Regions:
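Non-catalytic, structured segments within soluble enzyme domains
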Residues: 1-43, 50, 191-192, 196-197, ...
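Second-shell loop/turn segments in exported
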Residues: 2-9, 36-43, 102-111, 149-155, ...
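Active-site SXXK
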Residues: 52, 84, 106, 110-137, ...
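Glycine-rich, acidic and aromatic/proline-enriched surface loops and short helix-turn segments
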Residues: 16-24, 78-95, 128-130, 142, ...
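Conserved catalytic neighborhood of penicillin-recognizing serine enzymes
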Residues: 4, 130-186, 234, 246-276
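Mid-domain, small-residue-enriched loop/turn segments at the edges of structured enzyme/sensor domains
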Residues: 148-150, 182-223
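Short coil/turn segments at secondary-structure boundaries
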Residues: 9, 31-37, 65-73, 178-180, ...
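A penicillin-recognizing enzyme superfamily signal
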Residues: 42-65, 76-80, 89, 96-108, ...
Length: 427
């Protein structure tokens, strides 16, 4: 009956994860853990955990269903980008005291929407297929298996660069890139970043838009984006640094082990594009914080009960820098025509980015946020913007290119353009 007398403790969601991890590491039951006199040293940043609990107590920071007026649920992961240590978590807006089993939403599977695009398409495209931020992708009408693929705004823009396609989260270029590199290639790549897929997922072109069979968890998304933030190296998350037994003997000591999954050059290029997303793209409410970020929105299911309903199912945000990776999910445990997120500007990107902004501003207060360091294997190149946008050519800026038409772009060393623009030469 020991589990029935689960002790009450503060920071419930975090402590549940600590106890679960400790029981697994020591191979003991929870009741033995409670009564065995162990001392567990956790990775929690107590001040930050208390802050996120206060943040999550503010109901106006979460969208309400436009039909029922119910406030949505949310999950939050704050991970140390470098070590994989969890420093603060929220598995819901509040912790339901006195219950034996509690739904921890950071471990609940949901469809990821566009937040998965960089993981299954663009990062492997840069790593394995020599894509650059100015690789041109055709954003023109596309039908896959008889289903039209549409951008969120239902517009198409013709030839766009990869930087624009990813930072603005266009759907058509994402599907085209995913098909170009091969669905299995993209899936295998993301598996190395800790995201599990089913056999069926290997055959889904819409996987790049979040159309997974079983979905993913906020924890898995945090791990994957922390790999981008940590220069291409993957590690498992943990809540525990050390465990001592009742005699003071250390019975477990965490040792961080990392695996280099892709190059730091690839990581830097994707991070730089996702900084554009945080400045002028889908996560623009994070502007000025030097963060890289990717939003994700999941549409309501294609079921008769939702035919007349305007709204969305899930809203995601992954934001990160070299020190902290933050993932926010918002939605309802059971989406219905009564309970769903509002669509439009009050939907996905707004509330998730507001939470992340509050969090990073609190962590860094008035101090400078760290930026991603450019690896030696990446060249900074000045391009001619007119040639890029009007001629759809990747050409170096010349001495004649006016300053306002010079754009800085990044290439892996050896793949830089060599031809100079003649756009400004008077005939």
């Amino acid at each position: 009956f020991a589990e029935d007398i689960k002790p009450a403790y503060i920071h419930g969601y975090f402590m549940d994860m600590v106890l679960e991890e400790a029981a697994s590491l020591l191979n003991v039951g929870l009741d033995d853990l409670y009564t065995g006199g162990y001392r567990i040293y956790t990775t929690m940043d107590k001040e930050l955990q208390e802050y996120v609990e206060q943040l999550y107590a503010q109901e106006d920071l979460f969208p309400k269903s436009p039909v029922s007026g119910e406030t949505s649920e949310s999950a939050l992961v704050v991970m140390d980008t470098d070590t994989g240590e969890l420093v603060a978590v929220m598995g819901g807006r509040s912790y339901p005291e006195g219950q034996r089993s509690v739904l921890n939403r950071i471990e609940a599977r949901r469809l990821p929407g566009s937040v998965i695009k960089p993981l299954v398409a663009y990062t492997p495209a840069v790593e394995m297929f020599d894509y650059t931020p100015v690789t041109f992708i055709d954003d023109s009408p596309l039908t896959v298996n008889g289903i039209p693929i549409r951008n969120a705004d239902r517009e198409t823009r013709g030839i766009v660069t990869m930087r624009e396609a990813l930072s603005k989260s266009y759907n058509i270029p994402a599907v085209k890139t995913f098909q170009e590199i091969g669905i299995s290639t993209g899936v295998s790549f993301a598996e190395k970043l800790g995201i599990p897929f089913t056999e069926d997922d290997h055959y889904r072109p819409n996987l790049v838009l979040g159309g997974m069979e079983q979905g993913t968890t906020p924890l898995e998304i945090a791990r994957a984006f922390a790999s981008l933030g940590d220069r291409g190296s993957y590690k498992e998350e943990t809540t525990i640094r050390r465990i001592d037994d009742s005699h003071g003997k250390t019975v477990y000591q965490n040792r961080i082990s990392k695996e280099q999954v892709f190059s730091e050059e690839t990581a830097f290029i994707i991070n730089d594009i996702l900084q554009t997303a945080a400045d002028t793209g889908t996560a623009y409410r994070l502007k000025g914080l030097k963060l890289a970020a990717k939003t994700g929105t999941v549409q309501l299911p294609s079921l008769p009960e939702f035919d007349e309903v305007k709204g969305i199912n899930d809203a995601w945000l992954a934001a990160y820098n070299p020190e902290y990776t933050v993932v926010v999910w918002m939605g309802f445990d059971r989406t219905s025509k009564e309970n769903h997120l509002p669509s439009g500007s009050s939907g996905g990107g707004k509330y998730t980015t507001l939470i992340a902004r509050e969090l990073y501003e609190h962590i860094y207060d008035e101090s400078e946020l760290p930026n991603f360091q450019k690896p030696v294997g990446v060249s900074e190149v000045k391009l001619d913007k007119k040639a890029l946008e009007e001629q759809k050519r990747v050409l170096l800026a010349s001495a004649l290119t006016p300053d306002e038409y010079v754009v800085t772009e990044y290439f892996k060393r050896g793949s830089e353009p060599t031809e100079q623009s003649d756009y400004w030469v008077v005939p």
